[in-house]
């Protein structure tokens, strides 16, 4: 099969927009290292309105920087693509497209006036940028965009995001009117998001959101806030196989990788197009990453990258809502109060997608209130890492310390009697 080359505009025909309405180029971010111009061209050429594709690479290493630009024949064509593709699944992967209006050619976000943003928490796992945006835009015409923050290694939602408004008055109305209303299957928790500083380059990211959780000292324990990425974690033996032939079975996938070492687990999710392979040893997984990259399995050349081991958060084998409840540390059938503390939205930080970076509470001289602990004596702060596996017993104990008086009988998710003894009951 002949190599596909991305379309290129005629020399000297580059379009230099003077206003936002003239912009016809989209920024695309959160790209995996294997994504190149050919792949993006295959994704967007079906629009029939594509002019050029460019993936930005490091000038020294030549490696992709994780973002690029896609030019269309007109502003209207670019806008249609933005509305159609943003937040949808990228072919052959479990990731979603992250699109926004591009700059005037330097990687800077388009300056379209004042930026008034809100924080939106407790989002359901199926909420995309587009769904979040439209939830607000049907009520407020000045909505400029929305961003659901995702785990960069899995592409899955972290359960919160931001919505931008051009008008401060509409931002304030939305905070009052939309708080507690449903987006998808969950009520939203809304508050203002104050920019820490202007982030001009859209490819800047803050990949870890750290925020305080107040828990009783009786069940509090030191938490290591840093979680090594899979490629740096010597205990990780799992790889992700993208662009997988839809007809390949789990048994065939296991057979293809067993030549490199003992395979102890294989999973192809119901949506297919990708899969996971877990080896018994780390060296076998490393060899698979090196040797199987670009190899043909079935009828397609696969793309290999590191993944998290089964059982680690962010690694979900199927779209089971109960698994998502566990991922966020919620007791099955219970809401966000299972954390035992109200998360302060201002502590989230996110710098990608052209959104400003927001301050984390605790910076400078700010104090963190313990009021969310319900006045529990000895309550203390603990950094919560959304990438770490949650301690469900601890979270449930914190919940009981505040809400036990309102619960009849013993909660089904309270697995042992140790929680009662820990709380001195």
Swiss-Prot record:
Keywords: mRNA processing, Nucleus, Repeat, RNA-binding
CDD domains attached to this UniProt entry: RRM1_SECp43_like, RRM2_SECp43_like
GO cellular component terms listed in the entry, alphabetical order: cytoplasmic stress granule; nucleus; U1 snRNP
Disulfide bonds listed in the record: none
Compartments where found: Nucleus; Cytoplasmic granule
InterPro entries (UniProt xref): Nucleotide-bd_a/b_plait_sf (IPR012677), RBD_domain_sf (IPR035979), RBM42_RBP45_47-like (IPR050825), RRM_dom (IPR000504)
Domain of life: Eukaryota
The keyword Zinc is assigned to this record: no
Molecular functions per Gene Ontology: mRNA binding; poly(A) binding
Pfam families recorded: RRM_1 (PF00076)
GO biological process per UniProt: cellular response to heat; mRNA splicing, via spliceosome
Domain RRM: 24-102, 116-195, 237-309
Family membership: Belongs to the polyadenylate-binding RBP47 family.
Subunit-structure text: Interacts with the poly(A) tail of mRNA in nucleus.
PANTHER family: POLYADENYLATE-BINDING PROTEIN RBP47C-RELATED, TRNA SELENOCYSTEINE 1-ASSOCIATED PROTEIN 1-RELATED-RELATED
Entry function: Heterogeneous nuclear ribonucleoprotein (hnRNP)-protein binding the poly(A) tail of mRNA and probably involved in some steps of pre-mRNA maturation.
Protein name as annotated: Polyadenylate-binding protein RBP47B'
Gene name of this polypeptide: RBP47B'
């Amino acid at each position: 099969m002949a190599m596909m080359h991305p379309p290129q505009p005629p020399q000297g025909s580059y379009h230099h927009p003077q206003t936002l309405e003239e912009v016809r180029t989209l920024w695309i971010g959160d790209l995996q290292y294997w994504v190149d111009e050919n792949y993006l061209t295959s994704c967007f050429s079906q629009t029939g309105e594509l002019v050029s594709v460019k993936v930005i690479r490091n000038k020294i290493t030549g490696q992709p920087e994780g973002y690029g630009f896609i030019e269309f024949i007109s502003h209207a064509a670019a806008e249609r693509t933005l509305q159609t593709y943003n937040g949808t699944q990228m072919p052959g992967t479990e990731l979603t497209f992250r699109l926004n209006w591009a700059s005037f050619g330097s990687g800077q976000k388009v300056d379209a006036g004042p930026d008034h943003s809100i924080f939106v928490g407790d989002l359901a796992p199926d909420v995309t940028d587009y769904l979040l945006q439209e939830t607000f835009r049907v009520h407020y015409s000045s909505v400029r965009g929305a961003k659901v923050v995702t785990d960069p290694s899995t592409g899955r939602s972290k359960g919160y995001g931001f919505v931008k408004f051009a008008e401060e008055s509409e931002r304030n109305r939305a905070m009052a009117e939309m708080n507690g209303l449903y987006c998808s299957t969950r009520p939203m928790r809304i508050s203002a998001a104050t920019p820490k500083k202007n982030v001009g380059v859209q490819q800047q990211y803050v990949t870890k959101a750290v925020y305080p959780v107040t828990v009783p000292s009786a069940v509090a324990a030191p938490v290591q806030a840093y979680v090594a990425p899979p490629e740096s974690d010597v205990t990780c033996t799992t790889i992700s196989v993208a662009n997988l032939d839809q007809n390949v079975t789990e048994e065939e996938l296991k057979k293809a990788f067993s030549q490199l070492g003992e395979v102890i687990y294989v999973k192809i999710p119901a949506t297919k197009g990708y899969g996971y392979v877990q080896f018994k040893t780390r060296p076998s997984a490393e060899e698979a990453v090196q040797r199987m990259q670009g190899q043909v399995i079935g009828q397609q050349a696969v793309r290999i990258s590191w993944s998290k081991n089964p059982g680690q958060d962010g690694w979900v084998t199927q779209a089971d809502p109960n698994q998502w409840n566990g991922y966020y540390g919620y007791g099955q059938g219970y809401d966000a109060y299972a954390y035992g503390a109200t998360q302060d939205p201002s502590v989230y930080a996110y710098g990608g997608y052209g959104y400003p970076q927001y301050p984390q509470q605790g910076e400078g001289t700010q104090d963190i209130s313990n009021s969310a602990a319900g006045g529990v004596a000895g309550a203390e702060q603990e950094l919560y890492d959304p990438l770490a596996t949650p301690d469900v017993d601890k979270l449930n104990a914190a919940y009981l310390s505040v809400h036990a008086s309102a619960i009849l009988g013993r909660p089904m998710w309270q697995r042992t009697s140790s929680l009662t003894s820990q709380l001195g009951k």
